[in-house]
Design a protein with these regions (language model features):
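Short, solvent-exposed loop/turn elements at domain surfaces
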Residues: 28, 44-51, 66-73, 102-106, ...
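Conserved functional hotspot residues or short segments at active or partner-binding sites
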Residues: 345-554
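Bacterial Sec-dependent N-terminal signal peptides
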Residues: 1-25
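Cleft-lining beta-strand/loop regions that shape enzyme active-site pockets
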Residues: 18-31, 35-52, 107-111, 115-124, ...
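Polar, glycine-rich mid-to-C-terminal structural blocks
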Residues: 292, 304, 311, 315-376, ...
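Extended, small/polar residue-biased N-terminal targeting/export presequences
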Residues: 46-107, 153-185, 526-531, 536, ...
Length: 554
């Protein structure tokens, strides 16, 4: 009895944390044993022979999927995908391909500048017939992309059919290591002497590319700078810190990482003298601005070094590291949260890992208040909230269908390919526009093609009719429903006229890309960009710019 009492007292004296660790380790060991035994039984007794790579790989991926979208297992065959994500580089030919619904075939959509595809002479619309003798008819874009990639220095034969002539053309192309997208696909001086830099991602040497662009434009006398981080999904924290370092003094904390293990804790501090601490700066952001882009915009906001303009960012405030696995696999693992200089964690979603898993969106009502260097107040509401909110124009439904984002008769693609074939040259990227005659020709082709699309208003009306029937009001309101239905019927010609400005600019951007590549397309798009226009307006109003960066009087 005394021995039992002593054991109970000893157990009671054990630190709670130690007991929890012991229970946790026991649960881990038990579940690993169960998993191991289950697979042994499957391998030994299941009616069919199993592919261990597929079955175990699916089990691992399902387990990680229950945690968060960023913790991912890469088998040996998938490691190149991870490497491309980190470096921005891959070995291939450098072009965007897309699925043509009409031809049921992959086609060239956009060769990238200074890559093997552009140097070989491939054009938008070229139909990919075969790769090294293997027919590509009916093969999806993933399959075709995998065959376009390979080892650096390897040569292959590509056969395409050019729509303008109907003839097949053979190309011998040598693969090489190239950037998936340039870090800075476009920069240039805009109206009023304002510099503009489009930053597509934070990959190797992104900071150097931004520095080169900025220094060149500053030599030409710019009076302000716009850095465009819209649709920038992030990348390297170090590259983000290095870009911030261009505009803030040495020795400033840009971002701090905190995790379960000490090895996950890391602070990024500006380590060099800046190149400019006074140039007025506007950073453009939107809902697809994420991760390292939010580190950069959050730091500049906390230092009151620039004005953030656009819409609230994505809210990815967690970071990952990569770990080597047996047999040349790798694990990208979420290990920490990161915090802006003022201490904000901008993670928008909390991932729950118990009771089946769920996600919780951060609530504005429970958010804490943080202060910038000048004393401006911001809350950790999830994402970076812009200093000035400016919403971009939304894409109308008809434009979405014309762009072949869903099943399409390819009338837009065919028009663009024909236009390019008829015009060996066009006006400079920043000046090119379709004439009213050109747009009318496009409109007539759409009408003649039998183009159809779903209008959201018709969908909502159908849903409302079903609800009215369910609640017993439909018969009473039948005539009103029928009248509204007649008014909402498809009128493609009317919709093409009503949305002419948006559709026309969409076509212009596509056509310009065929002549001046991605940088030309971006330059062309800036003419009709509401958020860029607001940024230019702000940078030409010094008093308002300074006022925004001062704290509000209470």
């Amino acid at each position: 009895m005394k021995k039992l009492l002593f054991c109970l007292l000893l157990l009671g004296a054990m630190p709670v944390g130690a007991q929890e660790d012991k229970d946790h380790n026991l649960n881990v060991a038990k579940n690993l044993d169960v998993m191991n035994v289950i697979y042994k039984y499957l391998d030994m007794m299941y009616v069919d022979t199993l592919d261990a790579n597929e079955v175990v790989g699916n089990a691992i991926r399902s387990m990680l999927k229950s945690l968060d979208p960023y913790t991912v297992y890469y088998s040996e065959s998938d490691v190149n995908e991870l490497r491309t994500m980190i470096t921005g580089k891959y070995v291939g030919v450098g072009m965007l391909i897309r699925w043509n619904f009409q031809l049921r075939n992959a086609v060239v959509d956009e060769p990238y500048e200074n890559t093997p595809s552009a140097e070989a002479g491939l054009k938008k619309g070229d139909v990919i017939v075969s790769i090294d003798g293997e027919p590509m008819k009916g093969k999806d874009t993933k399959y075709v992309s995998e065959r376009l990639r390979g080892d650096a220095g390897s040569t292959f034969e590509l056969v395409v059919r050019r729509p303008s002539t109907g003839k097949q053309m053979k190309f011998k192309i040598t693969r090489r290591s190239i950037y998936q997208t340039p870090a800075v696909p476009y920069y240039g001086i805009q109206e009023g002497g304002i510099g503009y830099i489009n930053l597509s991602g934070f990959v190797e040497n992104s900071a150097k590319a931004v520095r080169r662009a900025y220094v060149e434009m500053r030599r030409k006398g710019i009076r302000g700078l716009i850095v465009d981080l819209r649709n920038n999904g992030g990348g390297s924290e170090q590259e983000a810190a290095d870009i911030v370092n261009m505009f803030v003094p040495k020795g400033r904390l840009v971002v701090s990482n905190r995790g379960k293990l000490k090895r996950a804790n890391h602070d990024y501090i500006t380590g060099m003298e800046p190149i400019d601490t006074v140039m007025p700066l506007v950073v453009l952001v939107n809902g697809n601005t994420a991760s390292a882009s939010e580190i950069m915009s959050g730091a500049l906001q906390d230092f009151d070094r620039g004005v953030i303009l656009g819409t609230r960012t994505y809210g990815k405030g967690i970071a990952q590291m990569t770990l080597d696995l047996p047999y040349n696999g790798q694990l990208k693992l979420t290990t920490n949260k990161w915090y802006t200089p003022s201490g904000r964690c901008i993670q928008a979603i909390t991932y729950k890992h118990a009771r089946g898993g769920s996600t919780v969106q951060k609530s504005d009502s429970t958010a804490k208040v943080f202060l910038t260097a000048h004393g401006r107040e911001f809350k950790d509401v999830g994402g970076i909230v812009p200093d000035i909110e400016v919403k971009a124009d939304s894409l109308p439904n008809i434009a979405y269908y014309l762009a072949a984002a869903v099943d399409s008769n390819e009338v837009l693609h065919n028009y663009e390919v024909d236009y390019i074939a008829r015009h060996p040259t066009i006006a400079p990227a920043g000046e090119f526009s379709l004439s009213d005659t050109d747009y009318e020709e496009f409109k007539q082709r759409v009408m003649a093609s039998g183009f159809k699309y779903d209008r959201e208003s018709e969908k909502y009306l159908e849903n409302l009719k079903e609800l009215a029937k369910f609640e017993g009001y439909y018969d009473e309101a039948r005539s009103e429903f029928e009248a509204l239905e007649n008014k909402l019927k498809h009128n493609v010609a009317k919709d093409l006229d009503y949305n002419k400005r948006v559709i026309k600019h969409m076509i212009e951007n596509d056509i310009v890309a065929a002549y001046y590549y991605q940088k030309g397309s971006i330059e062309n798009s800036l003419r009709d960009d509401k958020q860029v226009a607001e940024a230019l307006k702000l940078l030409n109003d010094e008093a308002k710019y300074r006022e925004i960066l001062r704290p509000k009087k209470k």
